[in-house]
């Protein structure tokens, strides 16, 4: 099972609808993961988000940085829901991994872009918003584009097709020995960053 379903949106949507973002994502994750287990699914891959990491995390982000500091306030409810999904997979592995031979994993993609993206400036993510702003400015012959923020945050981007390849590869080729390269202290760890840094 590949669990990619989620309520998603950009900064404005996250700020305006925090209850929807935490509630709907918690419901999706619990229902799908529990139903997968109840149906005898042995392998599940849950797609999280890089927003699970603290606001001031060092770059490139490492898996061990999870829960090491405060989250970005604008998307904290969404991030908390995604962290709960990770912990749910980890808990299923801890409780049922050996007895039921299950392996529920999580991938944390970077900022995605590609076909089918949402270009509505009120709900889009950063790449689609930038493309839309620059496209509109070009069409109106404007010489300047106003972007949000200070310009200092670092972002890593990944094409959605590359994530698709990574998802298939990880679920089909996951080797428990890979675990020792992520976080040695937690044998039940379920998550792996994809498309971040070089490690």
Predicted regions and their residues:
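Active-site Tyr-X1-5-Lys
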Residues: 31-34, 73-110, 129-140
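Conserved Rossmann-fold NAD(P)-dependent oxidoreductase catalytic core, especially the SDR/UDP-sugar
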Residues: 3, 30-75, 105
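Alpha-helical substrate-binding/gating segment
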Residues: 112, 127-145, 155-192
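Flexible, glycine-rich beta-alpha linker
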Residues: 52-54, 76-77, 100-129, 153-154
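Structural signature of the Rossmann-like NAD(P)-dependent dehydrogenase/reductase core
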Residues: 3, 43-48, 105-111, 146-149, ...
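NAD(P)H-binding glycine-rich loop region in Rossmannoid oxidoreductase-like domains
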Residues: 1-24, 38
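Short-chain dehydrogenase/reductase
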Residues: 22, 26, 65, 74-86, ...
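Conserved catalytic-site region of short-chain dehydrogenase/reductase
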Residues: 10-11, 46-62, 77-83, 87, ...
């Amino acid at each position: 099972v590949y669990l990619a379903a989620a309520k998603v949106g950009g900064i404005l949507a996250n700020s305006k609808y925090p209850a929807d973002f935490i509630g709907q994502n918690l419901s999706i994750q619990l229902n799908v993961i529990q139903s997968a287990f109840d149906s005898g699914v042995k392998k599940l891959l849950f797609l999280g988000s890089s927003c699970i990491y603290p606001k001031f995390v060092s770059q490139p982000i490492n898996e061990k940085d999870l829960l090491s500091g405060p989250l970005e306030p604008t998307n904290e409810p969404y991030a908390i829901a995604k962290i709960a999904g990770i912990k749910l997979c980890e808990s299923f592995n801890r409780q049922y991994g050996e007895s039921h031979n299950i392996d529920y994993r999580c991938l944390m993609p970077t900022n995605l872009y590609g076909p089918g993206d949402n270009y509505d400036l009120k709900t889009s993510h950063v790449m689609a918003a930038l493309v839309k702003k620059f496209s509109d400015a070009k069409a109106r012959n404007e010489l300047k584009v106003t972007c949000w923020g200070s310009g200092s945050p670092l972002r890593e981007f990944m094409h959605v097709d590359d994530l698709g390849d990574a998802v298939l590869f990880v679920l089909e080729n996951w080797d428990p020995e890979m675990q020792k390269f992520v976080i040695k202290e937690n044998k039940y760890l379920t998550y792996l960053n994809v498309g971040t840094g070089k490690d």
